[in-house]
Each structure stands twice: as C-alpha cells, then as structure tokens.
C-alpha cells in the first residue's frame, strides 16, 4: 500500500520529562519516528516539554515546540500550525493520554485532524481494563479472574469473593503507577484509594494474583494490510509479581519449548490483529511453569520500554518502522535498514543472548523501601550481549556501575542464613547477589527455587557461575579454567580477586597466550543474509567480525544507565560529540551499555560497541580499533572515572588532561589554584578520619556541608547543623578514608548560579549564566533555574565571567566545563568546578543556539573558538526568559523523603519559555504537572525559623484569593499579622479544631502543601509524614520558600488584582 498523500504536516507528541516508568526510551523512539517521517517527505511538528532530549533538537523536526504537554498548550499549537494529522503512539503513556484528552475536547474533529497509527478506539480497548477483558473473553483468550472497580468498597467485595492475594492495576497509567500486590483488606484499601486517584479514568482492575508464573513478553508489529510479525520474544528472570521494568530480562526466551513458544506467539499475533493496532505493540503473558496454561496480562498499544530493549537486542528499529506504518506503508514494502536487502516482514533471528538488568536509585535513597512488586522503581537499565546466558548476565552486572562488579557481594557474604533466605523470599533489587551467595553456602537449586519461584534453568545459570568461582580460586593461572571463565563473562577484575593478584597481571597473562575477545555483529538475521551493521558485542569466541577501518577514529565513552544525577542529558552531549567528530572527517566510535538511548542507535555513529563501561572492556576495544584518542568529557562521572586508568595504559585522553581533571577534583590542588587566582570560595577542609571530620566542623563552625570527594548528583551530601547530626551522617555513609576523603565546607546562604563554559586553552566562551531559584543548600539538579539571570546586576555578572575565564585557563581546560557559584554579600564565591559536560548542556544549547557539545568537541580536536566564529566572554543574552524546572518520581518510591537538600532527587526536567519571567515560570510549573487553580487552598507547615519569611508569601496567597490552613503555631503567628487562617490539628493531636492536618490532606481539602519542617533524619518525623501524605494523595508539594515565591509570581501573573481605592 503506498504511503498516504492526504496528509502533509504531522504533529508528533513527545513523552515529557523523565520519570520512573517513562525514561530515555521515548527520546530514542521519538527521534527515530521524526526522522523516518521526514525521510518519507512529510513536514513534522514536534511538541515536548523536555529540553534534555535529542528529539527536541531543531534538526530532528521541521518545527520544535518545547511547551507543556497539556490540552490547553497543545491545542494552542494545533490552532497555530493546523497539522493534518497527529501521531500519538511514540510519546509513551503521556502522549497517549494527551491524544485521548484532545479528542474528547472536540478540537481534532473540528479541524479535521486525523490520528495516525493505532486508532483511539483500539487504544481505549487495550487500556480500558473492562473493555480489554471483554475482548479477551470474545477471543477466547484466558485472563486472570478480575473486575474493574471505581470505588474501594467494590474492590473489597470482589477480593473477598475470589480470595487474596490480589493485584491492583490502575487504568491508563504506566510503570505500574499506583498499583501493587495486596495480601489483606488493609493493604487493598490503601492501594486502591491511591490507584483511583492516580488513574485518569478513576478505575482500577482487581485481579487474582498469578504470582510464580513465568512472565513472557512478545514485541509485535502490524500494518494496515493485517500483516503481523514478532520482532522479539523476551523472558523475565523474575516470575510474575515483579514489574517487568524491575525484572532481569533475557532475549530471546530461554526456557520455552517449541510448542509453548508457538502457542504464545500465535496468541500475541491474534491480539494485535483483533485490536487493529498499526505499528508496534507489547504483549505480556503469564505461563504456568508446570502445564500449558497461560494468561494474557496486558497489551501496551504503543512503543514502550520493552520495544526500545527489543530494538537494541535485535537491531530491528521498531519505532522507525512504526512511524512508516502509521503513514500507510506495509511491512512487505519497507526495507529492513539493517540488512538493506530483506524486507521488514522477516522476523529477526538471534544467534546470541541478551540480558537486561534494571538500575535502581537505592544508592542515593538509602532509606527507601527496596521491596520489588508491581510498581516500578528502577530509573534506568543496562543491556549486555553474549554467546551464552552466563556471559550476558555477568557483563550486565558489571555494566550497572554499582558497588558490586560481579556476583560476589560483601553484604551478602556477611549475612546470616536467615537473612539470605529472607532476601530470597522477599525480592529486593539485590536478590541476584543473595541467590549466588545461597549457592556458595550449599543450598540446592530446588531450595532456592522454593524461596524465589525463579525458573530452575535461570538458577542453574547462576549456580554454574558460582561453581566456576571456586574452580578459579583453586586453579590459579590455569589457562583452561581461565578460558572457560572468560567465556562465562568473568572479568579480569573478578579473576584477579579470586587469584589474589592484580587486574593488569590477569590481562597480561591473557594477552601473552592470545586469549582475546572477538567482536560479533548484531545483524537481525543470525548471519543468514549479508549484513553490514556497524553494531558489535564482545565474546570469547572464534571469528572476529569487526574490522578496523583506514580512517582516523575517535572513541567516545557514553554515560551508562540512566540514574539520578546522571540522566539523558549526558547522552545528549555524547550524540552531539559524535556529530562533530563525523563533520571533521574522523570515524566516530561509541561505547555504551544503555538500551534506552539515542547514542546506542547504531545509525548514529560509525561504529557502536554495546559493552560494559569498565576499564577492561574499554581497553579491549581500543586494542582492536587503535583510535587516535578517547573523549571522556560527555559521559558524566562514568567516563571521567575511566580517564586515569586509560592514561595509565598509555591511551591518549583528548581534551583536558588527566592531571588537570584531577586538579579540579582534588580538594587541596583546587584550593591552591583558587588562592593563586585571588578568587573567593567558602572555607573548606578535607578529612580522612572521623575525628578529623568532627574537628574540621568545629573549626569552621556549624552549619557545615559534608560530602565525599569525587561524586556526582550530590550523593551522600548533607547540611548538618550540630555534632549529633554529623555523627548520624558518618554512621549512615562510608567513614572517611585516605582513598575516600570527606569534604567539610562552611555553608553560606545566598543566591546560587552556574555557568557552562568552553575553553580552547586561550579563549573562554560562556554561552550563558543560569540563576537558581532555590537558595544555596538545594542541589543544582533539583533547583529551578532561570536564564538570563533575573537578580544579578552587571557587576555580579562580570565577577562570574572573570572568575570563569581565570579558572578555565588556570585549570588548562580544553573542551567543556561547569562552574557553580554562590552570591554572598554581593560577591561571587566559587562552590565547585566540574571539568566535563554537565546536565545543563542541552538546556543552554537549546536556548542560545550554540551546539555546546559540538563546539567543545571541535575544540578538543584542535579547532579554536575563534576559528569557529566565537569570541571570549559571555554570549549575548536572549530576549526570551527560559526556566528549567525539576521533575520528581516520589510517588513511585515509598519512604524517600521529598524534602529538598544537597542530595539530588529529581529524575527529569521540563522547560518553560516566554517573554516575561512570570509567564516562563507558569509554563515550567505547568510542564512539571503543578497545575493550580486561580483560587484554591494552601496548607502551611513551617519551621519556626522560616515564619518571618513566610509572612509576605502568605499575604500574597491571601491577595489572590487562596484560603490558608496552618497548625497552631504558624496559624497564630499569621493571624497576629492580620491574616485569616484556619487552624488544623497537628498529626496525632485532637485539640478540638474543625479538621485535622491528616484529614485535610487525605480528603483532598488542599491544592498545595508548603512544608519547610526540616528532615531531622527521623523517618517518622511530622515533616516527613506530611510530605508523604501529600505525595500519596497527588497534592502539589513545595519544601522551599524560594520555590513558593516563584509559584506565586506565576499565579499572580495569571489572576487579576482586586484592590479597594
């Protein structure tokens, strides 16, 4: 069927900010789709609120709008652009829900706008729990006993009828939001109440639990001619009961017989045809491990996290083809871009095994509830490819960049047998390490299966890895055992640990005996057809398929899995670095381990190595490719941490040298540089013992800021007010050591700001200064930022520019760097310097038009700023005002305190742009889903020290017609100052007031909670409980008065003043 000619301009809806359950995979799929539509000759208009994406680059679509993803905002753009059609299935759940909401307003019908790809009715049928169940019964496909409910009572009645445990699944949500497993009525009441609140349709499905079944996924495609095919089958290591986004996953399926595979494949194809889905779709199935009985769990009628994984696992570009199907092309007329010869209807065949492991944020949230269930908690994931499941699994573990670099966990080793069994029975993020530990202690596969319900095959894989461990320990330098270990994915690091030697010695032994990895191609067809994809993985196999080219090449190290503190922004910088390398005529080679990102799309670079980002794996690629150098500035802390090891092996680090990187990161060297330049910084000390930490704090004077050296995202960083808090901090975090010193700084109050700068060794370009809206003490990644600055005069800007130029030249920065300042008493103090790309690069690049990562890469490769047409100093400021706002995923992480401080907690960001600060703020708040009514209710729970500061804010709330509620102390203070405030009872206190704080929040009596009650390290503190209640009930929450001030500016700008004469 030829492509559509009745459509010329297509609007693509993006997925908005990164949150748990909806991460970088939609940047990848959205980018692919826009490029595919343009390739077919259509004009593309893109709407997305997330500036940190490749998708929102001006060359991806004909027109790019970075605006809030709301009905009001998108309707405005539709009336401005008049697209012929909208493609909503590539923007995740956000894009789908927005398309449904737009259709309900009647605007699509009014303007004759078509929906491309899967139609609304099909989306509704797959997403509406009751309609989906009815369709399954019509098709005679089994679903677990279930009922759609709209009240808590209905849920309780149905659960009583079918018996516990039951699973709750809210409709039209993603990442298992608001869902969960319930063993009793109390849990059910709580989870259903929350689920109904979070479901746009206010409905939940209550279903009989089928925990312990195998969880199987099929990624399927269908076109308008009803051709359908399976792209990839995937099997969860964890049985049903743990969200697939929190499960280890293998592709292709490993434990299905041919009969089981065909049965589930046929079911998946039957479903996609019955739902009339056009494009990609994900089918989740549960299979009884002891019979041929299966159930359909759900269908996602859109491109999803699993489709990004399936695309990278097979090399088959699902989103690209889904976009082409949406405009009428069929699978039998689209060429497979990988082989270039076969058509897209050929099902991919894999001659390797892929393992995916989720990356959780619990290293940052040590107090979070780590139990895994039906609600997703991972922020990202890693993928590894091997010739065996053992190899893929071990490579994936070392890709995670956590404390454990293999299956040997010190924590698991020191646990008692009871603790090990508890960890096996109640799944947490670290269960895999405890399974390995159980086998070390002599537990049988059957005993571990009884506790975990994990398939015997997968347990056997772990057991084989553990058995080889003891063989390695007993046969030091035995080449046969070494060969087997390398085929099982063992790293030199682990082998060295078991042999009691060094990693370099193992490496030298391997090289001496020619035991080297080869690189295999990912070609979608198991080598059945000729293929020339530049997409490789390593294995200790026979034939090497990756040939070094004659061109000079540069290796760019990616940033690994998405986690808090190191998000999609670094992938953005990596992709732009690759573009610059290619424009200068070099071959660009990328190494990365993240299946969700644009950088691991093999069409982006000249060669892609999908490998763990460890020293051994990077050196192996360098041995083969012999690049002229390696760029580490764009891969976040992951890449920077590899620099010293690479240099020690005589690898050329391009750009800022390792010695100069070290000078910026090493406290004493840095302090010396600051002193030599005559710049100011807060008083700071370095301590290597606990006693020293306490002595330093005494000497500087409380409050102090304490943090470990060499971290990203403010991990383990805290403001402490007295010695007791300092002792608590040291007990919670690793003690100070010679190798890992702790930094103690004076805590200065004032306005924070940051700059990104590009330096060629002589000239220094500052694309812009970003002022933080929250005062010092809130991590820069969690702070709202505004460009150009609103509170700085020319004198302060000049101080910042002078300090930046001096530092960049003195630190011999070649490439990009980020500096954070605090403005205290009208003077700029240097807080920290990061000699690499920071998370603000995409934001600043978009608003200034300077492709910062590309400019920096050209500098790194020897082209000066002057040769690129830039001069030293601050780039001209834009006429518009741009605000970057953080977005959090607290609703997915129980027990994480939402009080903002120096430890970063946000998962994503949005941007608001307009001609006034207030309007830009309003758009940023709206984009971050903080949509407040013109006159609503606000609850103020304020620390004593903040009462004076809250008074002017309370007066402004009163002026725009907000009703105020507060507990006794705050209420009395505000009433004494002439304001009308309703007093509410404190938590757990009944003092005869009309309502209590608890009931006010639980019964949705307020629209906004402002809570500055400090996090006194007590999980049960009132402040913490209030914040948790607000998050559970989906109520806007602010913990900083600066943010409240900004929100008021936005609200005041929207409402009319009413003053008497």
Swiss-Prot record:
GO cellular component terms, alphabetically, are:
cytoplasm
Q: Which residues bind Mn(2+) 3?
A: 820, 832
Molecular function terms from GO: ATP binding; carbamoyl-phosphate synthase (ammonia) activity; carbamoyl-phosphate synthase (glutamine-hydrolyzing) activity; metal ion binding
Mention one GO biological process in which this protein takes part, according to its record: L-arginine biosynthetic process
Q: Which chemical reaction does it catalyze?
A: hydrogencarbonate + L-glutamine + 2 ATP + H2O = carbamoyl phosphate + L-glutamate + 2 ADP + phosphate + 2 H(+)
Q: Which residues bind Mn(2+) 4?
A: 832, 834
Q: Where does Mg(2+) 2 bind?
A: 298, 300
Give all residue intervals belonging to the ATP-grasp domain.
Answer: 133-327, 671-861
Its EC number(s): 6.3.4.16, 6.3.5.5
Q: Which UniProt keywords apply?
A: Amino-acid biosynthesis, Arginine biosynthesis, ATP-binding, Ligase, Magnesium, Manganese, Metal-binding, Nucleotide-binding, Pyrimidine biosynthesis, Repeat
- PROSITE patterns assigned: ATP_GRASP (PS50975), CPSASE_1 (PS00866), CPSASE_2 (PS00867), MGS (PS51855)
Annotated Mg(2+) 1 binding lies at 284, 298
Annotated stretches, region: Carbamoyl phosphate synthetic domain: 547-929
Detail which positions bind Mn(2+) 2: 298, 300
Q: Where does Mg(2+) 4 bind?
A: 832, 834
Enzyme class, broadest EC rank: ligase
Chain residue ranges for the region called Allosteric domain: 930-1061
State the pathway, as annotated in the record: Amino-acid biosynthesis; L-arginine biosynthesis; carbamoyl phosphate from bicarbonate: step 1/1; Pyrimidine metabolism; UMP biosynthesis via de novo pathway; (S)-dihydroorotate from bicarbonate: step 1/3
Instruction: Report the superkingdom from the record.
Output: Bacteria
Q: Where is this region: Carboxyphosphate synthetic domain?
A: 1-401
Q: What does this protein do?
A: Large subunit of the glutamine-dependent carbamoyl phosphate synthetase (CPSase). CPSase catalyzes the formation of carbamoyl phosphate from the ammonia moiety of glutamine, carbonate, and phosphate donated by ATP, constituting the first step of 2 biosynthetic pathways, one leading to arginine and/or urea and the other to pyrimidine nucleotides.
What quaternary arrangement does the UniProt entry report?
A: Composed of two chains; the small (or glutamine) chain promotes the hydrolysis of glutamine to ammonia, which is used by the large (or ammonia) chain to synthesize carbamoyl phosphate. Tetramer of heterodimers (alpha,beta)4.
Q: Which family would the database say this protein is a member of?
A: Belongs to the CarB family.
The protein's name is: Carbamoyl phosphate synthase large chain
Q: Which organism is it from?
A: Ligilactobacillus salivarius (strain UCC118) (Lactobacillus salivarius)
Gene this chain is encoded by:
carB
């Amino acid at each position: 069927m030829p492509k559509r000619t009745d459509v010329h301009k297509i609007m693509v809806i993006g997925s908005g900010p990164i949150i748990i359950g909806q991460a970088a995979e939609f940047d990848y799929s959205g980018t692919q789709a826009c490029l595919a539509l343009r390739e077919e000759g259509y004009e593309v208009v893109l709407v997305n609120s997330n500036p940190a994406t490749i998708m929102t680059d001006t060359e991806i679509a004909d027109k790019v709008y970075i605006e809030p993803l709301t009905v009001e905002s998108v309707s405005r753009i539709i009336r401005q652009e008049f697209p012929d059609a909208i493609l909503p299935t590539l923007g995740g759940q956000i894009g789908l829900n927005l398309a449904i909401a737009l259709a309900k307003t009647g605007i699509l019908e009014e303007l004759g706008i078509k929906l491309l790809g899967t139609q609304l009715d099909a989306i509704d049928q797959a997403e509406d729990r009751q309609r989906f169940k009815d369709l399954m019964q019509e098709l005679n496909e089994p679903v677990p006993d279930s009922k759609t409910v709209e009240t808590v009572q209905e849920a309780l009645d149905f659960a009583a009828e079918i018996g516990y445990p039951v699973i709750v699944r809210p409709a039209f949500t993603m990442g298992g939001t608001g869902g969960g497993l319930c063993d009793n009525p109390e849990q059910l009441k709580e989870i259903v109440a929350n689920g109904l609140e979070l479901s746009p349709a206010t409905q939940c499905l209550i279903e009989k639990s089928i925990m312990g079944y195998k969880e199987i996924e099929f990624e399927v495609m269908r076109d308008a001619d009803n051709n359908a095919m399976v792209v990839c089958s995937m099997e969860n290591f964890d049985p049903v009961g743990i969200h697939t986004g929190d499960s280890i996953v293998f592709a292709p399926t490993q434990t299905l017989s041919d009969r089981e595979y065909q049965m589930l494949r046929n079911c998946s194809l039957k479903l996609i045809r019955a739902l009339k889905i056009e494009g990609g779709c994900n089918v989740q199935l549960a299979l009884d491990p002891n019979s041929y009985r299966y159930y359909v769990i759900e269908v996602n009628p859109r491109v999803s996290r699993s489709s990004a994984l399936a695309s990278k696992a097979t090399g088959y570009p699902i989103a690209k083809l889904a976009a082409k199907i949406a405009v009428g092309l069929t699978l039998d007329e689209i060429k497979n871009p990988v082989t270039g010869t076969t058509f897209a209807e050929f099902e991919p065949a894999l001659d390797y095994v892929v393992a995916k492991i989720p990356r959780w944020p619990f290293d940052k949230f040590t107090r979070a509830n780590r139990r895994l269930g039906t609600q997703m908690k991972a922020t990202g994931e890693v993928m590894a490819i091997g010739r065996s499941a053992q190899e893929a699994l071990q490579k994936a573990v070392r890709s995670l960049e956590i404390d454990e670099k293999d299956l040997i966990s010190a924590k698991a080793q020191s646990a008692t047998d009871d603790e090990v069994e508890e960890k096996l029975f109640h799944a947490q993020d670290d269960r895999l390490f405890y399974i390995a530990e159980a086998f070390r202690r002599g537990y049988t596969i059957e005993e571990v299966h009884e506790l975990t319900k994990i398939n015997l095959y997968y347990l056997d894989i772990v057991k084989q890895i553990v058995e080889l461990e003891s063989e390695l320990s007993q046969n030091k330098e035995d080449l046969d055992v070494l060969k087997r270990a390398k085929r099982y994915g063992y790293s030199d690091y682990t082998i060295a640990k078991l042999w009691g030697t060094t990693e370099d010695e193992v490496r030298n032994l391997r090289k001496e005996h020619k035991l080297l990895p080869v690189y295999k191609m990912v070609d979608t067809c198991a080598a059945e057809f000729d293929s020339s994809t530049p997409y490789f993985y390593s294995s200790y196999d026979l034939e090497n398929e990756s040939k070094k080219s004659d061109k000079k090449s540069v290796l760019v190290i990616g940033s690994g899995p998405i986690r808090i503190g190191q998000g999609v922004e670094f992938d953005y910088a990596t992709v732009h670095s690759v573009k610059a390398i290619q424009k200068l005529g070099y071959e660009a080679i990328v190494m990365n381990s993240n299946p969700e990102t644009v950088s691991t799309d093999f069409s982006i670079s000249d060669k892609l190595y999908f490998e763990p980002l460890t020293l051994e794996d990077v050196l192996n690629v360098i041995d083969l490719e012999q690049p002229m150098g390696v760029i580490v500035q764009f891969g976040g802390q992951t890449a920077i941490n590899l620099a010293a090891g690479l240099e020690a092996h005589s690898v050329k680090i391009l750009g800022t040298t390792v010695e100069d990187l070290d000078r910026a990161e090493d406290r004493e060297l840095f302090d010396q540089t600051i002193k030599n330049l005559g710049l100011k910084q807060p008083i700071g000390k370095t301590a290597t013992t606990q006693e020293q930490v306490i002595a330093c704090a005494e000497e500087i004077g409380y409050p102090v800021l304490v943090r470990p050296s060499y971290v990203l995202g403010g991990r383990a960083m805290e403001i402490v007010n007295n010695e007791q808090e300092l002792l608590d901090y040291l007990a919670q975090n690793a003690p100070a050591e010679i190798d890992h010193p702790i930094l103690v700084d004076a805590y200065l109050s004032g306005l924070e700001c940051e700059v990104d700068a590009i330096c060629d060794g002589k000239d220094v370009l500052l694309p812009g200064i970003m002022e933080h809206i929250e005062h010092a003490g809130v991590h820069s990644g969690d702070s709202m930022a505004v460009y150009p600055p609103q509170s700085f005069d020319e004198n302060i800007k000049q101080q910042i520019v002078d300090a930046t130029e001096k530092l960049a030249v003195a630190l011999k920065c070649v490439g990009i760097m980020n500096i954070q300042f605090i403005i205290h008493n009208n003077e700029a103090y240097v807080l920290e310097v990061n000699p690499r790309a920071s998370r603000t690069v995409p934001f600043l690049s978009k608003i200034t038009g300077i492709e910062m990562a590309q400019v920096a890469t050209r500098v790194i490769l020897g082209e000066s700023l002057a040769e690129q047409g830039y001069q030293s100093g601050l780039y001209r400021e834009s006429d518009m005002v741009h605000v970057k706002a953080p977005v959090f995923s607290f609703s997915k992480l129980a027990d994480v305190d939402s009080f903002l401080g120096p430890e970063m907690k946000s998962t994503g960001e949005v941007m608001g742009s307009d001609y006034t600060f207030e309007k830009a703020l309003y758009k940023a708040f709206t984009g971050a889903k903080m949509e407040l009514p013109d006159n609503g209710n606000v609850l103020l729970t304020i620390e004593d020290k903040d009462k004076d500061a809250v008074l002017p804010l309370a007066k402004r709330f009163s002026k725009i017609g907000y009703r105020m509620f507060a507990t006794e102390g705050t209420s009395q203070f505000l009433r004494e100052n002439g304001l009308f405030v309703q007093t509410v009872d404190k938590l757990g206190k009944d003092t005869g007031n009309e309502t209590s704080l608890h009931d006010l929040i639980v019964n949705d009596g307020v629209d906004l909670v402002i809570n500055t009650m400090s996090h006194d390290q007590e999980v049960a503190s009132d402040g913490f409980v209030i914040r948790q209640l607000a998050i559970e009930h989906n109520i806007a929450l602010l913990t900083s008065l600066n943010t409240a001030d900004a929100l008021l500016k936005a609200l005041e700008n929207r409402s009319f003043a009413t003053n008497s004469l």
